Design a protein with these regions (language model features):
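C-terminal non-catalytic regions of proteins with extracellular/luminal or membrane-system context
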Residues: 86, 93-98, 132, 168-169, ...
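A structural micro-motif
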Residues: 13-14, 53, 139
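Acidic, Ser/Thr/Pro-rich beta/coil linker or hinge segments at domain junctions
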Residues: 135-184
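Aromatic/acidic polysaccharide-binding cleft in carbohydrate-active enzymes
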Residues: 17-108, 116
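Glycoside hydrolase catalytic-domain groove-lining segments
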Residues: 1-25
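Short, well-ordered loop/turn elements at secondary-structure boundaries
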Residues: 11, 49-51, 114-117, 185-187
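Carbohydrate-binding surface patches
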Residues: 101-137, 141-148, 187-191
């Protein structure tokens, strides 16, 4: 995993995108579930590869495609996906030279924390097959999954992403993966920080 710089940082966005994904037509029945995280993260990665613009998610807490439940305002899976994207993926986009294919949508950016290194997102959209990546050194891994595609609760490294009793956000911490082969199970979205 040695990406080449694809575009330089540009703080003046050129494209502003609204009504993306599930917003058109009132949303889909799975927009509030883990199943939609694949679309959301793929959209963020693909959009970043072509512009430094902005994606506006038009609904915070209304209907099925809102980031929060419209009844109790609990964060849905896409909320946590966008939160992790913003915490991990930096503004400089790298070309991974990996073609998008089933089982491996690979995106690479600078690290959002400003430290040297690279942040990757690998989306394994295969419902049945794992995929493998090679890590050149130990890495921090945030692996998103769920008990079922239509689950309303997403897991990060096996821990449910739900609010605490005091409505605080959960602590989202990585696990360390040693250098070498890392197997990514089917139907997972994995952030890898090197």
């Amino acid at each position: 995993m040695k990406p080449e710089v694809k575009q330089k940082e540009n703080r003046h966005g050129t494209i502003c995108k609204t009504e993306s994904g599930d917003a058109g037509g009132g949303g889909t029945t799975w927009a509030s579930t883990y199943q939609d995280v694949f679309r959301t993260l793929n959209e963020l990665g693909s959009f970043a590869a072509i512009t430094d613009g902005i994606i506006f998610h038009n609904t915070l807490a209304s209907s099925d495609y809102g980031y929060l439940s419209h009844t109790v305002f609990d964060p849905r899976p896409n909320y946590f996906a966008a939160l992790l994207w913003n915490r991990i993926m930096g503004r400089t986009v790298y070309d991974t030279a990996e073609p998008i294919r089933e089982g491996a949508h690979v995106f690479a950016h600078s690290r959002a924390d400003g430290k040297p290194g690279t942040a990757y997102l690998v989306i394994n959209n295969s419902k049945t097959d794992p995929t493998t990546v090679s890590l050149p050194k130990d890495a921090e891994v945030y692996q998103l999954s769920a008990e079922a595609l239509r689950a309303g609760t997403m897991l990060c490294n096996g821990k449910p992403l739900v609010l605490g009793e005091d409505n605080s956000l959960p602590e989202i911490t990585p696990v360390t993966a040693p250098a070498g082969e890392l197997t990514l199970p089917a139907a997972t979205c994995t952030f890898i920080v090197l």
